[in-house]
């Protein structure tokens, strides 16, 4: 089964601010989710409905936070950012699980 991969508008705005090589690496890594939506680790606490896919680019750890909608066979990327900033940015976006 192949899932549809969507990027939430707030995530897209922040994504476009990243350097092109980082964008390309994040897009390539996110493609895994189409066939394996459970590839990322489940988050805990207030973001327990989100999952996080980890990758390292040029020595910097990045996270792709996403939500899986099984019935619709859809994945929505909520945010892609460096590990050090992702939870602060999720809080700023006021995402509700």
Regions found by a protein language model. Give the residues of each.
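A general secondary-structure junction signal
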Residues: 9, 47, 79-81
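A short, surface-exposed loop/turn module that caps and links secondary-structure elements
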Residues: 31-58
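Enriched for short, Lys/Arg-rich terminal
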Residues: 4, 13, 55-97
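Short, flexible helix/strand-to-coil boundary loops that buttress conserved ligand/catalytic motifs
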Residues: 19, 26, 37, 90-91
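Arg/Lys-rich, positively charged N-terminal/basic patches that mediate binding to nucleic acids
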Residues: 1-29
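Conserved short hydrophobic interaction patches
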Residues: 29-32, 83
């Amino acid at each position: 089964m192949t899932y549809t991969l969507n990027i939430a508008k707030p995530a897209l705005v922040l994504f476009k601010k990243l350097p092109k090589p980082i964008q390309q690496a994040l897009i390539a890594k996110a493609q895994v989710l189409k066939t394996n939506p459970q590839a990322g680790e489940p988050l805990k606490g207030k973001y327990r409905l989100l999952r996080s896919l980890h990758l390292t680019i040029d020595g910097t750890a990045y996270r792709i936070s996403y939500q899986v909608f099984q019935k619709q066979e859809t994945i929505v990327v909520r945010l892609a950012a460096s590990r050090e900033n992702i939870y602060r940015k999720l809080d700023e976006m006021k995402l509700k699980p």
